[in-house]
């Protein structure tokens, strides 16, 4: 008598992040992709009322990213993430470095944008209601020095977001290790 067929073992279900961490992750993801896309789009527009409106929206979203980043960092520092999924050391190191750089850019990109806007003499009024203080004094020469740094750091963040998504998709479709479920919104 032959032994019964035993299906191959599936990887153990990965522990999930907290609901708050998941909500903050996806809110930031949507805001970052939307703000970056708007920045690329509005950059090429001729000077017009529409362009000014888009710049205001871009700045509102940037300040929102900054505020949510402070919340996300505070949550992350006070709530341990779930245990990591087993993976080769180089992948774990690459994932860790990518996350650290993303967190740094969550703060750097909006702060450099705020400094640029302040130096250029364009105040930020968050959602048209809350005027924010200038980050640096008005100085057109300084604004021209800061502007490319906002663009470069935004491009670096976009590249890291693409790398982050590629890594998640690799785990989902190649490794099939359930890693992506750790941050997937709960199904009702």
Place the predicted regions along the sequence by residue.
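Membrane-embedded alpha-helical bundles that constitute the cytochrome b-like, heme-associated redox core
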Residues: 1-188
